[in-house]
From Swiss-Prot:
Pfam families: H2O2_YaaD
Family: Belongs to the UPF0246 family.
GO CC terms in record: cytosol
Species in which this protein is naturally found: Janthinobacterium sp. (strain Marseille) (Minibacterium massiliensis)
Source species, domain of life: Bacteria
Biological-process GO terms, alphabetical: response to hydroperoxide
Name of protein: UPF0246 protein mma_1385
Length: 258
């Protein structure tokens, strides 16, 4: 079983990593190509391109300027420990033990606008580049064109290596759009998390994002190898709803926490 996650906008490079184990990203050459393009933009242009504030644009212009094709413990941090958004609050990688980290490294992949695909322990230099950014490049008008089939082929390689029964999609629509399900060598299962509010079940963004991280952590904690085992996920009051699910979309619902 292979799980894919989205990255996070917020990063934590201040907290020391609790493990020295790391790997290098597979697509440093491609990342360098994107960095070269991004360095041509002023902070004002970055603010417009990414629809972010001027201070954030300046921060990221400095990040792009400092980016190096050489990844070290000084300029980088393991991706799963550097990301710090809602998903990663649920994942809580900083409290994972060696066995759980090893599971994550084997069974989880993080989709990234700059790095394409990251293993959880791949060293990552700080950046902000969302997959939906319309950054023109030699391959086309945006990052989906830039990455082409690369991400799908990389996932297929891992699927073949571990003889995965399915790809579990815990990423957002924006990020999973870089994956081409028709070319994948395993079916895609997408867990959906809903909360009861105002008389109906609905997706509440913060809770749904956090639940994706919780499910990835659940898989690592239990050492899950088969997707069917995820139906037992019961963290924070969520339960699998068979009646509302189908082969491709698995519904997990709860009536508490709101």
């Amino acid at each position: 079983m292979l799980i894919v996650l989205s990255p996070a906008k917020t990063l934590d490079y201040d907290t020391p990593a609790h493990t020295e184990i790391s790997s290098k990203p597979d697509f440093i050459k491609q990342s360098a190509e994107l960095i070269k393009i991004l360095r041509q933009s002023s902070p004002a242009q970055i603010a417009s391109l990414m629809r972010i504030s001027d201070p954030l644009a300046s921060l990221n212009a400095n990040r792009f300027a400092a980016w190096s094709p050489k990844f070290t413990q000084k300029n980088s941090k393991q991706a799963m420990l550097a990301f710090n958004g809602d998903v990663y609050e649920g994942l809580d990688a900083a409290s994972m033990d060696a066995k759980q980290l090893a599971y994550a490294q084997s069974h989880i992949r993080i989709l990234s606008g700059l790095y394409g695909v990251l293993r959880p322990l791949d060293l990552m230099q700080p950046y902000r580049l969302e997959m939906g950014t319309r950054l023109a490049n030699a391959a086309g008008k945006d990052l989906y064109a830039f990455w082409g089939n690369t991400v799908t082929e990389t996932l297929n390689q891992r699927i073949a290596e571990q003889q995965s029964e399915a790809l579990v999609n815990l990423a957002s629509e924006e990020y999973f759009k870089v994956v081409k399900p028709a070319l994948l060598k395993a079916p895609v299962i997408t867990p959906v998390f809903q909360d009861w509010k105002n008389g109906q079940y609905k997706i509440i963004s913060f809770y749904a994002k956090r639940a994706r991280g919780l499910m990835a952590r659940y898989a690592a904690t239990k050492g899950i190898k088969r997707p069917e085992e995820l139906k037992s996920f019961d963290v924070d009051g969520y339960e699998f709803d068979a009646a509302a699910s189908n082969e491709k979309t698995w519904m997990f619902r709860r009536k508490v926490g709101i």
